[in-house]
Amino acid sequence: MAEFIMVVGTSSNSGKTTITAGLCRILANKGYKVAPFKSQNMSLNSRVAKEDGEIAIAQYTQSLACRVEPSVHFNPILLKPKGNFISQVIVHGRPYKDMNYNEYRKNKDFFLKKIKESLEILDREYDYVIMEGAGSCCEINLLKDDIANLRIAELVNAKAILVADIDRGGVFASIYGTIKLLPENWRKLIKGIIINKFRGNVEVLKEGIEKIEELTGIPVLGIVPYDENLVLPEEDSQVLQSMRSFGNAKSGVEINVVRFSKISNFTDLDPLRYDAFIKFIDFDDDITGDILIFPGTRSSTKEAYYLKQHNFDEKVLEFLKDGGIVIGICGGYQVLGKELIDKEKKESDVGDIEGLKIFDAKTYFGNDKVVKNSCGFLEIDNKTFNVKGYEIHEGFTYSKEKPLIKIERGFGNCGNGFDGSIKKFGDGLAIGTYFHGIFENYEFRNYIINLIRKRKGLDEIYGDSYKDSIEKSLNYFAEVVERSVNLKPLGI
């Protein structure tokens, strides 16, 4: 039988995900078998669990904090927005239906049943389950249909913590309002409050904390400091709307990333942040970097349409002829082909469309979706790299180019034992692959970065800076939480 703890928030982006990860790592460090859990998540950033099903990137990262293999039961319901208020609903890792909010709401009992099934499995297999809520736990206009917050805590009699973000202001009002608006049976579940993202001297909060404890009858368990150095994968593509660049501006290597309107799995870029400067470019921008990446997208045909409208194919070809390196991942790989065939308009309302014609390849869209943890041997310049990744794609690609990866496990282009395409343009190089997470393979990542560094007379890089940073961040934040928060009321 597991102990259940739930982290809920006064708002979105209050820090629930990182607090949950911190608690997971604290308990894992104590030798417990721990599982993360989020009943319902909405994200275009997903990973593949051990059952070859999709879960949100946040629950994947939290599984790293727990030091356990990710499972579809960590995130039984995943909503992947498709546009026009429609989401693809993923249940236990597999596509269920495309639904709007009203359809989803009417099927609440079915989804609740699936959530309960996952909770029963986790209850049997783990010592602790650290649950994360979604958004605000008290959207009073949505409470009767909310299956992501305290209704789920009540099912398992979880001890709940309320997290409030002081950085955005109004923290005490948001705490008081949230608690007072909750139904009494859910209010009783909250055992403590965490004030998150604080900058400055904690003494200035003393009077406010005393007052909020008096008004609510719930103790403030701790104040967690704001820390810009904490680097964990983002799950929300909204962060990209205002982001122009990130990474190491002193690295000597610049990577341009095409800013797709429906970008997905942009965490593919995270491993590059330590060894390159990453700059997003729009369709009408010039290519200024050493490497150009076409990331994943929820709508390859629509992105191909916009790229062609801006004559981006001409820019890419010129860039390759000048010695540039172009890399397409998943949907980004599809748009680099000759044609995208979508006769029934399954992928978008665009239908069939020409790609950028970098590769002699055609992609066909149908009803099937590939979700696989994959591995194989990547060959480039007479070098072979043993690589791992994960595939989440609709569309099968038939390429006449040299394949990039000989598959040992997975699906790849079209189930023929190969993945991707590779093509040289003089000193230029074009690479396409369905392997998300390709840059997590540090030997391949370093090889690509070092191609540019050698051209510029810079020293080569070695080692796995990304993996080291994730572990360092998880351990560091666990220490911060343990130091800042009184965990005894939670039984930790």
Swiss-Prot record:
Q: Give a yes or no for keyword Electron transport in this entry.
A: no
InterPro entries named in the record:
Class_I_gatase-like, CobQ/CobB/MinD/ParA_Nub-bd_dom, CobQ_GATase1, CobQ_N, CobQ_synth, GATase_3, P-loop_NTPase
Which residue range or ranges hold the GATase cobBQ-type domain?
252-444
| Domain of life, source organism | Archaea
User: What is the protein name given in its UniProt record?
Assistant: Probable cobyric acid synthase
| Active site (catalytic residues) | 330 (nucleophile), 436
Q: In which pathway does it act?
A: Cofactor biosynthesis; adenosylcobalamin biosynthesis
Keyword entries, A-Z = Cobalamin biosynthesis, Glutamine amidotransferase
Q: One biological-process term from Gene Ontology?
A: cobalamin biosynthetic process
PANTHER family per the record?
A: COBYRIC ACID SYNTHASE, DETHIOBIOTIN SYNTHETASE
**Which function does this protein serve?**
Catalyzes amidations at positions B, D, E, and G on adenosylcobyrinic A,C-diamide. NH(2) groups are provided by glutamine, and one molecule of ATP is hydrogenolyzed for each amidation.
Extract the Pfam families matched here.
Answer: CbiA, GATase_3
| One GO molecular-function entry | ABC-type vitamin B12 transporter activity
Underlying gene: cobQ
Question: Of which family is this protein a member?
Answer: Belongs to the CobB/CobQ family. CobQ subfamily.
